[in-house]
Amino acid sequence: MSLSRRRFIQASGLALCAGGLPLQARASGAQAVLPVPPLLESRRGQPLFLSLERTHWAFMGGRKVGTWGVNGVYLGPTVRVHSGDDVKLIYSNRLSESVAMEVAGLLVPGPLAGGPARQMSPGVDWSPVLPIRQAAATLWYHADTPRHMAPQVYSGLAGLWLVEDQYSKNAPLPNHYGVDDFPLILQDKRLDNFGVPEYDPPSSGGFLGDTLLVNGVQDPYVEVSRGWVRLRLLNASNARRYLLQLSDGRPFFVIASDQGLLPAPLQADTLPLAPGERREVLIDMSKGEEISITAGEAAGIMDRLRGLFEPSSMLVSTRVLTLRPTGLLPLMTDTLPARLAADPLPEGDVVNNRSIMLGSASSPGINGALWDPGRIDVQARQGTWERWTVRADTPQSFYIQGAQFLVKSVNNAPPLVEDRGWKDSVWVDGEVSLLVYFPQPSSEHFPFLFYSGTLELADRGSVGQMVVQPAQ
């Protein structure tokens, strides 16, 4: 059959375009090994140092490019602290612009919570002493600089922060960091042909990249022992929500959410992960079969070709991580504990009901008002409970600093099973009802913040301020 001139040109053009695809869109070579961030553990009497600085990192192809990071690496070390300790933390800003930092999910008084009120100019340090008085949980630290949070987090100012307590130390769960207990920080970026991250914030809504990174690399693998493997998942993307699943269809065993362990392990076939959310899961590798975690549907060839001429929001590859079991099955394999949390989830009497309306992609703000550092939007009382009804026409994540909450309903239906524990971040697509508890006080000079987890919307004003009066 003859080939017409037009069809020949079309076919030739597709072949040429495919040959000129960005490196991340072509078939890759050997998979990268999962980088495990170094562990920075608190020791009594010794401060923790977090230096915010320029560094270099190879996002693809082994070629290092300039970026930001903490303590010399893209993203930062995993900090591990222990409940009951008082931890001296020293942030050092070695960058050329001002930065504010926050440990999202850390329950400390307002003056110690970081954020805009603790902004550091270039060359300046901030040294809070943090009383760690909460249950074991996977938290994260990140830039929280007014109107610059999105580009600074995107550039690499983020990392995991683990709280351990006596119960978590003794629980029959994998806890050997980097061996059977792995941090996974998910981000989406746009990389040019040389592997340099590009950031061009959209005029409305949040930034969506086309390249999925895990701990700073694409499509990594990790070798694990045959047995239970624990994954601590963090969505550190600016706006993208992920829907995770396992390649062979088996369920995740979910053991923890933002603010700590669930009452008992739960099974979930798919696992949503909104910006700022953390979840901990267990995967049974005892059968000795390789398995992958995926995050939705990847872009097809035509979508990749369009990406040559215009920014794409579809991920080139959606494979998060491949787990490769090695060695023999241990002589003894632990079964899942029937109970996880040391204490049942309490509930108290609601003293106030609030309605929170999050701004849209084109019209940011909260309850119709843009962030004003001189205005207090919410007055609450330490040790009390409130019901917050949060609404959004534009789907987005929502975070409350200095508080913890239980999700009571989502669009008038029961919440997902994996959302039954203590949380500080939640996906809002319509309406969610939250039972909010305030364990720590704040003040007008050092208020807590609540804001959109779509970081570009937060930078444009989708932020509110809250004073929690000390308990009487």
From Swiss-Prot:
The keyword Cell cycle applies. InterPro entries: Cu-oxidase-like_N, Cu-oxidase_C, Cu-oxidase_fam, Cupredoxin, FtsP, TAT_signal. Keywords: Cell cycle, Cell division, Periplasm, Signal. It is found in: Periplasm. Predicted to be exported by the Tat system. The position of the signal peptide cleavage has not been experimentally proven. One of its GO terms (molecular function) is oxidoreductase activity. This is Cell division protein FtsP. The gene is ftsP.
